[in-house]
């Protein structure tokens, strides 16, 4: 997961060194449909059973983001996206996949440190749409709200946007958790989008 995130960051930096992009005027508003890959995994405090490995769940991320340019170096963005999150347990002769699907609402501040290159952070509210272990509905076992901090980088060229983010969950995912059994649903996402000026 960390290697994939690092590769995305290096790709963005490489594009920055070899391409130019037009600065947007103050007060410009853009709308950006986006789609990409999400890598969900389990973090937090818990005791892993002996012989059981934790793995990531790879899924789809798709949505739209509106962005308002306050000036040449700062903008504020509000988005909505569907994200397939979760994790897998492999061991003891069985494999169990926990599928958590969220409707996420990210609110970010974007700092343009170079032409087209933005660093971003903020807060994201995730609303649980469904939760399954294999084909069994387990939504009642998980919290309906997931609050996280998105930390990301993006690069724009000819209105196309490559965006890489790590969403660090602040709230526990599982209900009835104990002090040594608090699960968090984190997400790494890499998306490609296109900006339309309105």
Predicted regions and their residues:
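Short glycine/proline- and aromatic-enriched beta-strand/turn motifs that initiate or cap beta-hairpins
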Residues: 20-67, 167-169, 195
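Outer-membrane beta-barrel channels and translocator barrels
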Residues: 26, 71, 114, 157-160, ...
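Residues that define the transmembrane beta-barrel architecture of outer-membrane proteins
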Residues: 27-31, 54-60, 99-103, 143-149, ...
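Transmembrane beta-barrel strands of outer-membrane/channel proteins
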Residues: 33-39, 80-82, 121-127, 155, ...
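Outer-membrane beta-barrel translocator domains and adjoining extracellular loop/strand segments
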Residues: 43-50, 88-95, 131-138, 174-179
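Membrane-embedded beta-strands of outer-membrane beta-barrel proteins
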Residues: 62-64, 105-107, 119, 151-153, ...
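Repeated loop/turn-to-beta-strand initiation elements of outer-membrane beta-barrel proteins
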Residues: 74-76, 117-119, 159-164
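Predominantly the C-terminal beta-signal and adjacent terminal strand-loop region
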Residues: 85-88, 138-198
């Amino acid at each position: 997961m960390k290697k994939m995130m690092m590769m995305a960051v290096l790709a963005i930096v490489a594009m920055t060194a070899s391409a130019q992009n037009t600065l947007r005027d103050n007060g410009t508003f853009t709308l950006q449909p986006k789609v990409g890959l999400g890598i969900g995994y389990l973090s937090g405090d818990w005791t892993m059973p002996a012989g059981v490995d934790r793995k990531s769940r790879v899924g789809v991320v798709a949505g739209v983001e509106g962005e308002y340019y306050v000036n040449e170096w700062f903008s504020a963005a509000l988005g909505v996206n569907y994200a397939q999150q979760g994790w897998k347990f492999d061991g003891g002769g069985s494999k169990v996949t926990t599928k958590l699907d969220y409707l996420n609402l990210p609110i970010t501040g974007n700092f343009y440190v170079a032409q087209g290159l933005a660093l971003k952070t903020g807060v994201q509210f995730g609303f649980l749409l469904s939760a399954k272990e294999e084909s069994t509905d387990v939504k009642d076992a998980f919290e309906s709200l997931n609050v996280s901090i998105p930390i990301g980088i993006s690069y724009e060229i000819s209105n196309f946007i490559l965006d890489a983010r790590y969403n660090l969950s602040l709230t526990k995912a599982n209900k009835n958790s104990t002090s040594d059994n608090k699960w968090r649903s984190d997400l790494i996402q890499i998306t490609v989008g296109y900006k339309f000026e309105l």
